[in-house]
Amino acid sequence: MKIYLVGGAVRDALLGLPVKDKDWVVVGATPQEMLDAGYQQVGRDFPVFLHPQTHEEYALARTERKSGSGYTGFTCYAAPDVTLEADLQRRDLTINALARDDDGQIIDPYHGRRDLEARLLRHVSPAFGEDPLRVLRVARFAARYAHLSFRIADETLALMREMTAAGELEHLTPERVWKETENALTTRNPQVYFQVLRDCGALRVLFPEIDALFGVPAPAKWHPEIDTGVHTLMTLSMAAMLSPQLDVRFATLCHDLGKGLTPKNLWPRHHGHGPAGVKLVEQLCQRLRVPNDLRDLAKLVAEYHDLIHTFPILQPKTIVKLFDAIDAWRKPQRVEQIALTSEADVRGRTGFEASDYPQGRWLREAWQVAQAVPTKEVVEAGFKGIEIREELTKRRIAAVANWKEKRCPNPAS
């Protein structure tokens, strides 16, 4: 029995990055030998065991053979005669097909170290084409390592295009698509994930609402980048700089979906695109089974982001109605989230990346003023039932009006 550290732990150690999870491969052992050594079996489809002390995963070396469609249609063979090289060959990328033995020696049969140095994401073998999930995984790796200047090898991107054109991605379940997308959205450069999917044709298959934005123009005065798809990815990039929150990033991605519905004869203007985009957000989230809290914020951002941009001319009554609409009294975090997504929208434009966004500050300040109005005083004044809400709203509007006159006067007044 020989044990090797494999995959991501070896890759990240060679890149000088923190190693989070360790996976191990065991060569020359049987399931019974693992059980006798105190390991606990957890793998259903193939033999995977948990170490009795560390609880890290130890898998018996195995090979895989395509036996059906999609990413689940594989037959696994795990036995003592499966070599380390054979196990590594079934992996997706050369940089993930690395192993390290007890002595610290790197085993690299598929030139993963060379590709690490060249900053290349390259598939190990043609078997890559048998698993459509790998298209999303490569896009996610491209996003994860974009800050290190990694790029996808030409032949790998070509294979990803072939897989997409062959309809392989249609076998992916919504849950798997969302899981990869969720992981990609938490990387330093989530926009790269969606750009790679577009480059290989997968964006049109998996995210048609986003793909439809490419080629849709916006007024050059407001959007020097002109293309709405390009703006969407620039905005997502900016959101990633402003916030690590998944919900902020996802909402930013969806903020302009309504522009894909504008008839061509009305281009480049997109009047009413915010409310129009809400249905598309709902559609995308339902299809991919996106969690409800992410969906709800994305719908609100789609509907109200343009309103935030016009904050100086908003009436105090409109500002308080906005807080009602986003349910800020029960979910105060939404004020900050919407301020961030609106800022990302403005700064996610060519030449505006370093712009100040005072509207975000004003929104936060107005919220502090509105929520500081004490409910207790309204109740003590004798108001009852629905009158409490009505009086509270009046007092909030008055407080915001007083604040706005001093801090953010209407430029037209």
Swiss-Prot record:
Positions with a binding annotation for ATP: 8, 11, 91, 137, 140
Reaction equation(s) it catalyzes: a tRNA precursor + 2 CTP + ATP = a tRNA with a 3' CCA end + 3 diphosphate; a tRNA with a 3' CCA end + 2 CTP + ATP = a tRNA with a 3' CCACCA end + 3 diphosphate
SMART domains for this protein: HDc
Cofactor-binding details, from the entry: Magnesium is required for nucleotidyltransferase activity.
Cofactor: Mg(2+); Ni(2+)
Residues involved in CTP binding: 8, 11, 91, 137, 140
Gene3D superfamilies on file: Beta Polymerase, domain 2 (3.30.460.10), cca-adding enzyme, domain 2 (1.10.3090.10)
Record-annotated HD domain positions: 228-329
Gene Ontology biological process terms in this record: RNA repair; tRNA 3'-terminal CCA addition
Keyword Transferase: yes
Keyword terms: ATP-binding, Hydrolase, Magnesium, Metal-binding, Multifunctional enzyme, Nickel, Nucleotide-binding, Nucleotidyltransferase, RNA repair, RNA-binding, Transferase, tRNA processing
GO molecular function: ATP binding; CCA tRNA nucleotidyltransferase activity; cyclic-nucleotide phosphodiesterase activity; magnesium ion binding; phosphatase activity; tRNA binding
A Pfam family the protein falls into: HD
EC numbers on record: 2.7.7.72, 3.1.3.-, 3.1.4.-
Residues reported to bind Mg(2+): 21, 23
InterPro entries found in the cross-reference section: CCA_bact (IPR012006), HD/PDEase_dom (IPR003607), HD_domain (IPR006674), NT_sf (IPR043519), PolA_pol_head_dom (IPR002646), PolyA_RNA-bd (IPR032828), tRNA_CCA-adding_enzyme (IPR050124)
Membrane-spanning ranges: none
Keyword Zinc: no
Protein family (similarity comment): Belongs to the tRNA nucleotidyltransferase/poly(A) polymerase family. Bacterial CCA-adding enzyme type 1 subfamily.
Misc. comment: A single active site specifically recognizes both ATP and CTP and is responsible for their addition.
UniProt remark on domains: Comprises two domains: an N-terminal domain containing the nucleotidyltransferase activity and a C-terminal HD domain associated with both phosphodiesterase and phosphatase activities.
Quaternary state and interactors: Monomer. Can also form homodimers and oligomers.
Name of the protein in question: Multifunctional CCA protein
Native source species: Salmonella newport (strain SL254)
UniProt gene name: cca
